[in-house]
Regions:
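Helix-loop-helix junctions that connect adjacent transmembrane segments
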Residues: 251-307, 313, 346-358, 364, ...
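Hydrophobic, membrane-embedded alpha-helices of multi-pass small-molecule transporters
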Residues: 110-127, 282-328, 382-393, 571
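Selective recognition of specific alpha-helical transmembrane segments in multi-pass small-molecule
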Residues: 147, 151-154, 253-266, 324-351
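Membrane-interface "cap" regions at the ends of multi-pass membrane proteins
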Residues: 2-129, 157, 177, 287, ...
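Extracellular loop-to-transmembrane helix junctions
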Residues: 86, 105, 130-191, 198-227, ...
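Membrane-interface loop-to-helix entry segments
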Residues: 223-270, 327-331, 396, 453-467, ...
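Loop-to-transmembrane helix boundary motifs in multi-pass membrane proteins
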Residues: 182-185, 217-226, 317-340, 376-377, ...
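C-terminal membrane-solvent junction of multi-pass transporters and transport-like membrane proteins
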Residues: 417-430, 465-515, 541-557
Length: 577
């Protein structure tokens, strides 16, 4: 049997022993290929069950088409076509996707729709952050909130650099996957999953709590599940429809917050006691001492940045250059409203009353500033706005977790069926419906005990932010040649990481009773992901112990199905070994 030939990047002929696993297919005329100039696709035939592997030279590709290749078995490594020439982009798409169809009607999100999806979550924080922060920081709350704005300013470039260098869904999971290992990346993914699940339940419950101010007969147990179900259906309709709803909610919320700021300023200008009220509040005795109060207030104020990381989990659905703009817009909102409301409250309400309204400080400010004084119309408007925007935070969780789980299934960290789309709206129905079931069950289990869930999601998303900064540093070291138009300097990354880590320590100290819940939720999620991640090893173990023949046949069939999926393997030479 004559030996076959393989070609390197310089088009030189290299003899290959006939026992080599890389045997080029006999229909390839390599002399013709050499004489005709550069070639862009060579099929390597792997004997046995491996099918056909196609070598695609992306560096030399200049827009021309490449000849198709016929697989050796029934694997979908190469697309079926009657045409002798298939575009390279379609070839790569068919290698990655389970089906060759593309949705040409898919439209990428613009700046404001992309901002609204994540912005509803982070902008809803002004409804509760000022009140919560005042419990520890008191009259110094606005200082703690400005420190949080500084952290987000640093993280704008940290997130932007990673998103532009690796524009794929997944957030911290994405950057750690490309710079470390699947195991480490899965830890970040589990933290993100826990954060989204807890955020959805807490936001839905808080929204219904505000809704009870408008309708006292509202049953919170069923209303929360109905709200989760509504956004499940909305997400099933598609991201474009969800983004339109999110944009409407975002505009209404920003308008309502602007109205409240105007009414507060009007109240301060009319009242002769505003300055006196501020001086009296400022002279209130601190709970411990000023630095400690500001520190614990800073930890609680970091609750207001939940949602900032969500934009990186649907970056593939955003248009070119949109991702950094979404981060900038969210930073504007948080930096403007959160510290401002905390400061304005010192002019119109005594400190004792501010601390009494821990969860509804803005509604109380609306009552104080309503004109005429006896009316409560502004309180009603703020309650309605809170119902809307906290509901929008539920939508943020749906969109974020869909992008993350879809990415994990593509990377085979989770079952591939989760990434399947329906023919109706081309959405990932298994992920969306599964998330609805999990959040509804969690709401039923906790039965309104939101303190533990709030502590869980606080620790989770701050841990994710810390891992994102670590991923940025590893990216600079390992993948420094990747192109990106925004670059976060080393001092910015290190300072941002330290500030988030310091805030995380404060949150852990303040939530020590809830650490057990965090470990429980994270442990269950991590166990499920690890079982999926190592499912082939689990199947091999079950096959080893034996059993009925039908059982073994089913296990072997499932094992072979997992192993036979097509994949892309990038190599610098013609020899993948």
């Amino acid at each position: 049997m004559a030996s076959s030939s393989s070609l390197n990047n310089d088009d030189a002929r290299i003899p290959v022993n006939e026992t080599s696993p890389l045997n080029t297919q006999p229909q390839q005329d390599f002399s013709t290929i050499i004489r005709s100039g550069p070639r862009h696709s060579i099929s390597w035939g792997f004997p046995g069950r491996w099918g056909t592997v196609i070598k695609i030279d992306l560096a030399e590709y200049s827009g021309e088409t490449v000849t198709s290749s016929v697989p050796l078995n029934d694997t979908n490594a190469a697309p079926e076509s009657t045409s002798p020439a298939i575009p390279l982009r379609r070839r790569v798409h068919n290698l990655v996707r389970p089906t060759p169809e593309t949705d040409d009607s898919h439209k990428l999100l613009g700046e404001w729709r992309a901002t609204a999806i994540a912005g509803n979550d982070i902008s809803s924080s002004c409804l509760y952050t000022a009140g919560i922060c005042s419990q520890k920081a008191g009259q110094y709350s606005f200082i703690s909130l400005y420190l949080v704005a500084l952290v987000l300013y640093l993280y704008r470039n940290i997130y932007s650099e990673v998103g532009l260098a690796l524009p794929l869904n997944g957030g911290a999971y994405n950057v750690l996957l490309n710079c470390t290992s699947k195991f480490i990346a899965s830890i970040a993914a589990c933290l993100t999953l826990v954060s989204y699940i807890a955020t959805a339940v807490v936001s839905a419950s808080s929204a219904i709590a505000y809704g009870q101010n408008l309708w006292s007969g509202l049953d919170p147990a069923w209303a929360v599940m109905a709200l989760l179900g509504f956004f499940c259906l909305l997400t099933l309709f598609g991201l474009k429809e969800s983004a339109n709803v999110a944009l409407v909610i975002f505009i209404i919320h920003i308008g309502t917050m602007t109205l409240l700021v105007i009414m507060c300023l009007y109240k301060i200008m009319l009242s002769h006691d505003s300055i006196t009220m501020f001086v009296k509040n400022w002279q209130t005795e601190s709970l411990q001492n000023v630095p400690i109060d500001i520190y614990y207030g800073f930890g609680l104020a970091l609750l207001g940045v939940s949602g900032f990381e969500t934009s990186s989990n649907y970056i593939e659905e955003q248009g070119a250059g949109v991702f950094p703009k979404t981060l900038r817009n969210m930073w504007y909102v948080v930096s403007l409203f959160n510290p401002l409301f905390s400061l304005l409250s010192l002019f119109i309400m005594p400190m004792s009353e501010i601390r009494q309204h821990r969860d509804d400080l803005l509604a109380a400010m609306g009552t104080v500033t309503s004109q005429p004084p006896s009316s409560t119309w502004l309180n009603t408007v703020i309650s309605a706005d809170a119902l809307l925007v906290l509901s929008g935070a539920v939508l943020t969780s749906y969109v974020g977790i869909t992008g993350l789980i879809r990415r994990m299934s593509y990377d085979r960290c989770l079952p591939m069926f989760l990434s399947y789309t329906n023919r109706w709206r081309h959405t990932n129905h298994f992920i969306i419906i599964g998330f609805f079931v999990v959040t509804s069950l969690l709401h039923y289990i906790v039965r309104g005990n939101l303190e533990s869930l709030a502590g869980v999601y606080s620790i989770s998303f701050l841990s994710v932010m810390s891992l994102f900064a670590i991923g940025n540093m590893i990216l600079k070291y390992k993948r420094g040649t990747l192109r990106r138009s925004i670059y976060a300097s080393w001092p910015h990354v290190i300072i941002g990481f330290i500030l988030v880590l310091v805030g995380l320590i404060a949150v852990i100290i303040l939530n020590l009773p809830h650490i057990t819940y965090f470990i429980l939720y994270f442990g269950i999620t991590f166990l499920i992901v690890m079982l999926m991640f190592s499912r082939n090893r689990v199947l091999k173990l079950l096959i080893y112990f034996g059993g009925p023949q039908k059982w073994l046949d089913m296990l072997n069939k499932h094992y072979k199905k997992i192993e036979d999926r097509p994949m892309l393997f990038f190599t610098r030479t013609d020899d993948p070994s």
